[in-house]
Amino acid sequence: MGSGPRGAVSLLLLMLAPPSCPAADCPAPCSCAGTLVDCGRRGLTWASLPTSFPVHTTELVLTGNNLTALPSGLLDALPAVRTAHLGANPWRCDCRLVPLRAWLAGRPERAPYRDLRCVAPPAVRGRLLPYLAEDDVRAACAPGPLCWGALAAELALLGLGLLHALLLVLLLCRLRRLRARARARARAALRLSLTDPLVAEQDGTDES
């Protein structure tokens, strides 16, 4: 009977404890201990970063890698995460960083992330990630395929506009020439009509 209350308390604590990550769910090359996933100092980049982590992860360590951004939705898929260690990474604060900036903006505490700074591009170099406005991040975006496509479309429209303007100028010049010729012919016909009676009268005078 004496062990009954202690057994009940132990069972309750076991039920309340967060589930640990099975070894099979621990992504390579990280190491896992309980709900802690340690991927720090593994030389990870955007391309080599694991695409997913155990859903019960409460602490994620990504410190000391070569990460310039995180894939969209990576942290949002971990609702149990209380802390993500992201320091000592060369964060590039452009379009790719928008998801991470949004995730940081939604954290109740920003103090653990105040050492995160932008390394590039030059416009935002040295700025603190948690206090970076989304407009600042988007303004630093390099032109993507859509931007280049829109630019090409604008240039094509500009070229068509210039071509139409050139054709219009040529048409106006042609019309002016035709009008000038018509006026010249009209003046010549008028002169001819005025000189014909004089010639006829002169011929009649000569005959008499």
From Swiss-Prot:
Extracellular side: 27-147
Positions of transmembrane segments: 148-172
Membrane-related topology note: Single-pass type I membrane protein
Subcellular location: Membrane
Keywords: Blood coagulation, Cell adhesion, Disulfide bond, Glycoprotein, Hemostasis, Leucine-rich repeat, Membrane, Phosphoprotein, Signal, Transmembrane, Transmembrane helix
Source taxon at top rank: Eukaryota
Quaternary structure (record): Two GP-Ib beta are disulfide-linked to one GP-Ib alpha. GP-IX is complexed with the GP-Ib heterodimer via a non covalent linkage. Interacts with TRAF4.
Name this polypeptide is given: Platelet glycoprotein Ib beta chain
Organism in which the protein naturally occurs: Papio cynocephalus (Yellow baboon)
